[in-house]
Amino acid sequence: SVFEAAALGCDSLSSNALPVTILQCGSAGLCDDLIISEYVEGTSNNKALEIHNPTPFDVDLTPYVMEVYNNGSETPIQSLNLEGVLVSGGVTVLGNPQAAAPIINQSQALSTVTWYNGNDPIVLRKNGEIIDMMGVIGEDPLGAWPVGEGAMAEYTLVRKPNIGQGSTNWLEGQTQWDVY
């Protein structure tokens, strides 16, 4: 939301001068790093990840790595070093190289990091530290990871609009998604 106000002296306001942007940054009010904002786990190879920059600054993607862990593994089976700059408020989409044309056409990168099937943890790291994740590394849920009224298999998950901070705790993180 954008509100405009200006101080006139000490006791009145005008509604036409100073634009102030109110960021939707979650309950803690922090938007200090990238987050996974959308997860697509569709039929066959129709899979994609969207990364969002909720910060007020453009972000160099060089220190970031996206990883996927398979079936309870403690080491990633696929990883992708991110490249470029993600503008403030912008998103980048990582698509499966064998996905249908609509996913491929919207992807800024095609990567095997999208080879997941609902029970595989997805991790976003910065300088080696986890800043956001879905699922739990080293655990196999014996099905798909639960998310709201759905799961990480055969659904599209979109981060709730009031979430501006990544989660490293899946018990908390699984409540941060709208399920489609």
Show the residue positions of the predicted features.
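Short, exposed coil/turn segments at beta-strand boundaries within extracellular/luminal domains
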Residues: 7-15
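Extracellular low-complexity, O-glycosylation-prone Ser/Thr/Pro/Gly-rich "stalks"
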Residues: 149-150, 155-180
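C-terminal edge beta-strand
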Residues: 15-25
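Extracellular recognition modules
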Residues: 1-6
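Ser/Thr/Pro-rich, low-complexity mucin-like regions
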Residues: 7, 125-128, 161-164
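Activation on beta-sandwich/Ig-like modules and their edge loops
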Residues: 25-156
